[in-house]
Amino acid sequence: STESVLRDYFHAKDENRPHYMARAFAPQAVLKMALRTQAIAFPPESHGLAAITDTLVRKFGQTYENVYTFYLARPEADVRLSDYSCDWIVGMTEKATGNVRVGCGRYAWTFQPEPYRATQLTITIETMVTLPPSDADAVFGWLLALDYPWTNARRVVAGAPPLEDLAPVVQYLLHPL
């Protein structure tokens, strides 16, 4: 189902388990990154399961930990959609500095019917903010109070800590493009 593919992707990326990527992506899949911020870097395109896994799991996992990504919508249970798009939010820490990163944007998925896997994922990163390690308790207290990995923008905004640095994220969630 669409839901299980999306869940397997987070098992791979958030939990640093590369073997899960083969349950989410077809061997010839394409990843496209649309960055609307300079705060994080990714190659604009990755072609094939190995390259996508390297970009989204192995290299990502070398740089970040405590990764919690949330889908801000949920596909119907037990359906196999040909495409699916939704907003997302992520919170994580930089291994090297302890700084906290919070970002948000949009996923646009395209799937093949058999075996049911993603053939394309476009990740748009609308904003990514960096907060000092001293804000980690407030940020992760907020994120860990959410239902993982499915929530909605209203719940995210309602529980957001009053940190000025989070304003761009909250603004996007209140007024997605």
Residue ranges of model-derived segments:
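Short, low-complexity N-terminal intrinsically disordered segments enriched in polar/charged residues
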Residues: S1-H11, E15, H19, R23, ...
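Terminal "cap-and-tail" regions of soluble proteins that handle hydrophobic small molecules
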Residues: S1-R7, H11, G91-L177
